[in-house]
Every structure is written in structure tokens, then in C-alpha cells.
Amino acid sequence: MKTTIVIYGSSTGSCQSIAETIASKLGVEAVDVANIDDATITSHENLLLGTSTWGAGEMQDDWYDGVKTLKSAGLAGKTVAQFGCGDSESYPDTFCGGMKELYDAAVEAGATVLPGVSTDGYTYDDSEAIDGDKFLGLALDEVNEDDKTEERIDAWLEDIKPAL
């Protein structure tokens, strides 16, 4: 596996916990987006970007500066996958919508973005983070479906590992 890092934005700790789980399974480092700089980006070939979702489907606040860093460092030649944390019961119309902003930023910065997971098996009404019948990354709901998190992470990692 090429140099890989997990970068996350988390306000309540759920997305941080997921990021640390993913990083542990890959044997890589997880870093809070509030602590990244251009060197963090340029020194890794693969970036796994995670955000919790807030408001009307926005990414976690620290990501707004993080996106500026992604763009200034540039992502040409890098592989990106994203994961999002949401609450499909309380916010069924914006489930994991923050992933869309990360996806758009990665594409704009020149990254090769890996496909996401199927929407099958998820309960929600709508999300900006969907393309066809797939999420733009791995969608997780630690509030209502935490019993599915481990299985979803493992399946996603199996899907993306060949590209990392």
C-alpha cells in the first residue's frame, strides 16, 4: 500500500472514532483536519477524508480551512476516498451530505476519487452525497445503525484497498 493517511473533521467524537478505526485497520495514522498543512497532503499518496454532517448537509466546520489546504497543496496524482457520518433518522433529507463538499473539493483539486458504496441497506430520504445508486463514499450512522458500522467499514476497505 502506498503512503496513506486518514484525515477527519469531528465535533462530537463519532467521526474521530470511525477515522481511528479505519486508520487502525489500515495500519496508518489518523489526523484531525484542524492539524493539517500542505506537507501533510504532499507527503501522502492516498487520502481518506472523513466528515460529520451538520446543518443542512454541510461538512464539519474545521473542513472549511481543510479544503483550502487540499486545494493549495493540490491533489493531482493522489487517490482520495471519503467517508461521512450522519443521522439518518433525525436528518433523513441531508444524510451524510457533508461528503458531497469533500468530494467536490477533491475533484476540483485534481484527485482521483474512488467510488463509494451502494445505497442499498440504508434508510434515509435524500442526500446530496449520492451519484446514481451509490454514495460518494462510505456513509455511516453511529446514532441509529452503529451495529452496522464495523461491517460497513470492512466491506468498504476491501473495495478500496486494491486502489491504495
Q: What feature does the model see in each segment?
A:
Residues 2-26:
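Short, charged N-terminal beta->alpha structural module
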Residues 14, 25, 29, 43-47, ...:
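FMN-binding flavodoxin-like domain, especially the glycine-rich phosphate-binding loop
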Residues 28-38:
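A short beta-strand-loop structural module common to alpha/beta enzyme folds
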